[in-house]
């Protein structure tokens, strides 16, 4: 199987690509964020291209290791008829970035285009609020050989786009998938709006084409639509070629050239790409790849880890941030950036554990209270009465009492039920109000039973 992708994602700008209409179309009433330009009314001329969109596209191209097109850049008119395209053509630039690479997949080109409106054929309505919003299109070479590879590539690409701060992420992603099997012809699949959808579409299409080839039936070169509700693809039309779109330079828009000075200025401002950060975290901090990927899942989380690792043992910091911090963020359905937790808060909490001011069990309770809380970990610990680790003699007394009062758990442990130990540890924690160290408590229990 050979697979290539064309990914479209909205750029995060305040105004549209060729006019000054706002881009917050999702909450606006239908056909309110519009003007004669984004409706392509007769006599309406486009503004010069949105500078933020151009810079965003260049930043993303650089993060994908593309070389920036040194030639004059200009916009073309791509002609086709559809109800969401009032002019009968879509403005799309020639490539701004070429010959990049991500996850072992070659990037053929990166360019900018305008989003069409939203057509709802079941209702017979068109909303032009989205019309003219800047898109970035990323075109890969057909380097992926399985649905899993395509899914992994898309996940990594979304991470790059989120790190860039220039794109709106998976929620605005639309992908076209090109797939061919040996002995068959290339088929394009449209109407894919998620990473999961791309994976399911490829799985279905791969099986469909295999079955056709086994029966000696020709695989037609065509465009198919993915029906997400049924997880199948259906034929739309024969595959178009570039000449079918009748590309011509747009006479209303001036050509542009990105100077070396502009490109290098942008290169200095782009963040380290997530896949490069993963590699550096493994080399610099001795982390496993799995841990490094979790800690780089958000740019803000990765930056926080680096700050914490400057004061706390990196492996200890990674353990707590990977397991406990991510657990709490997931439970609260918020990102690290939204949590209001600072690197200083994490340093303070981990230092309290290291100094044996609190137990690891107490620290887990404290970190659960930290999101969206203006109080620091020490203040939270004081209010909850969690400061202090009791003397071991008190722990021993609690252990012996737990063993005496729960002979059934002791018998279960001797019968091979390891979970019985956890029950006894829980009893000790209850008696000591969580101030006994769980690991040492387990040792004391095992010594006595």
Curated annotation (Swiss-Prot):
One Gene Ontology term of the molecular function aspect: asparaginyl-tRNA synthase (glutamine-hydrolyzing) activity
UniProt xrefs under SMART domains: GatB_Yqey
SUPFAM superfamilies recorded: GatB/YqeY motif, Glutamine synthetase/guanido kinase
EC number: 6.3.5.-
Catalysis: reaction(s): L-glutamyl-tRNA(Gln) + L-glutamine + ATP + H2O = L-glutaminyl-tRNA(Gln) + L-glutamate + ADP + phosphate + H(+); L-aspartyl-tRNA(Asn) + L-glutamine + ATP + H2O = L-asparaginyl-tRNA(Asn) + L-glutamate + ADP + phosphate + 2 H(+)
Class of the enzyme per the UniProt entry, highest EC level: ligase
GO biological process, one term: glutaminyl-tRNAGln biosynthesis via transamidation
Keyword set includes Protein biosynthesis: yes
InterPro entries, per database record: Asn/Gln-tRNA_amidoTrfase_suB/E (IPR017959), Asn/Gln-tRNA_Trfase_suB/E_cat (IPR006075), Asn/Gln_amidotransferase (IPR018027), Asn/Gln_tRNA_amidoTrase-B-like (IPR003789), GatB (IPR004413), GatB_C_1 (IPR042114), GatB_Yqey_C_2 (IPR023168), Gln-tRNA_amidoTrfase_suB_CS (IPR017958)
Domain of life the protein comes from: Archaea
Pfam families: GatB_N, GatB_Yqey
Keywords: ATP-binding, Ligase, Nucleotide-binding, Protein biosynthesis
Family listed: Belongs to the GatB/GatE family. GatB subfamily.
Subunit relationships: Heterotrimer of A, B and C subunits.
Matches recorded under PANTHER family: GLUTAMYL-TRNA GLN AMIDOTRANSFERASE SUBUNIT B MITOCHONDRIAL AND PROKARYOTIC PET112-RELATED, GLUTAMYL-TRNA(GLN) AMIDOTRANSFERASE SUBUNIT B, MITOCHONDRIAL
Function: Allows the formation of correctly charged Asn-tRNA(Asn) or Gln-tRNA(Gln) through the transamidation of misacylated Asp-tRNA(Asn) or Glu-tRNA(Gln) in organisms which lack either or both of asparaginyl-tRNA or glutaminyl-tRNA synthetases. The reaction takes place in the presence of glutamine and ATP through an activated phospho-Asp-tRNA(Asn) or phospho-Glu-tRNA(Gln).
Protein name, entry field: Aspartyl/glutamyl-tRNA(Asn/Gln) amidotransferase subunit B
Organism: Methanothermobacter thermautotrophicus (strain ATCC 29096 / DSM 1053 / JCM 10044 / NBRC 100330 / Delta H) (Methanobacterium thermoautotrophicum)
Gene name of the encoded protein: gatB
